[in-house]
């Protein structure tokens, strides 16, 4: 098996097997990769134009999860939830909604990442005011038990392949490929063993997805993959045709969230 065969197969619109997808993820994201950046870029571009079946997307999500460890939260009592937004201009909802859910008695566990494309991620916003989101699983568990919530950056042990793939996607114009977004988002959500997963799927000029039809298609894709993993989830499709709130920019968005 070699990457050239996989690129050609996907370029022809054919379905890849689980073994082939595992080969791509493992060989490109390992410490000494046998797949070069330009070969990975070619493969990802083929995925962008030819798409992936639900089975392929499931395999890619699974391979990303299996590249690292899962985060077991069973030692924490109560209902544990994870909330994720696909991102939009001025989107600071996670910073507001998380503490509100804790006030209602829920436990909020959020594994986050930097923003892709033109939207700032939750980690970017917190980093702008000096909040340290780099912590061990042990420290995150302490926070969850003590205050009912944590927002942490991806650790090297959780979905390490996703960090590598996000970097190459951001540099090659493949950020908007739906199967790649799906695998990236859900791998982190599924690796974190919460009871429920809530996703805010945005569309419009301020989001990476420009219309409702595409958002609905993506939402259905994510729900199908979640069901294949036997995880409970809910997806809200929300309009992002204007900025959320009255501030745009990481630091002032945090200030707006605090003043909400």
Walk through the language-model features, giving the residues of each.
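Generic structural signal for well-ordered, non-membrane alpha-helical segments
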Residues: 3, 14-21, 36, 40, ...
């Amino acid at each position: 098996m070699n990457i050239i065969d996989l690129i050609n197969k996907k370029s022809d619109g054919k379905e890849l097997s689980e073994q082939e997808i595992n080969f791509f993820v493992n060989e490109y994201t390992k410490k000494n990769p046998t797949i070069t950046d330009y070969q990975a870029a070619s493969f990802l571009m083929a995925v962008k134009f030819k798409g992936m079946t639900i089975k392929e997307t499931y395999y890619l999500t699974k391979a990303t999860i299996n590249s690292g460890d899962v985060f077991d939260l069973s030692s924490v009592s109560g209902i544990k939830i994870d909330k994720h937004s696909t991102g939009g201009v001025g989107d600071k909802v996670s910073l507001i909604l998380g503490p509100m859910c804790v006030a209602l008695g829920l436990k909020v566990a959020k594994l986050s990442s930097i923003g892709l494309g033109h939207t700032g991620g939750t980690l970017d916003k917190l980093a702008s005011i000096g909040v340290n989101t780099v912590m061990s699983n042990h420290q995150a568990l302490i926070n969850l038990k003590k205050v009912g919530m944590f927002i942490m950056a991806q650790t090297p042990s959780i979905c390490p392949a996703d960090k590598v793939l996000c970097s190459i996607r951001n540099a090659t114009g493949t950020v908007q490929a739906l199967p790649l977004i799906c695998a990236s988002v859900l791998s982190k959500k599924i690796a974190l063993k919460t009871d429920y997963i809530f996703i805010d799927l945005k569309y419009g000029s301020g989001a990476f997805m420009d219309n409702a039809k595409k958002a609905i298609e993506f939402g259905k894709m994510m729900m199908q993959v979640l069901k294949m993993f036997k995880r409970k989830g809910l997806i809200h499709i929300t309009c992002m045709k204007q900025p959320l709130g009255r501030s745009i920019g990481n630091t002032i968005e945090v200030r707006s969230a605090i003043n909400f």
